[in-house]
């Protein structure tokens, strides 16, 4: 999920991965 959202958001990966 982190990679999917990150690719779409660009910077979302960093925030998502940190939370996950």
From Swiss-Prot:
GO CC term, one of those recorded: extracellular region
Induction text: By low temperature.
Subcellular locations according to the entry: Secreted, Extracellular space
Modifications after synthesis and translation: N-glycosylated and O-glycosylated.
Main location: secreted
Annotated keywords: Antifreeze protein, Glycoprotein, Secreted, Stress response
pH dependence as annotated: Optimum pH is 9.3.
Domain of life, per lineage: Eukaryota
Job of this protein: Antifreeze proteins bind to the surface of ice crystals and inhibit the growth of these crystals, this inhibition causes thermal hysteresis. Causes the shape of ice crystals to change from hexagonal to a bipyramidal shape with rugged facets. Inhibits recrystallization of ice crystals.
Protein name: Antifreeze protein
Protein source organism: Antarctomyces psychrotrophicus
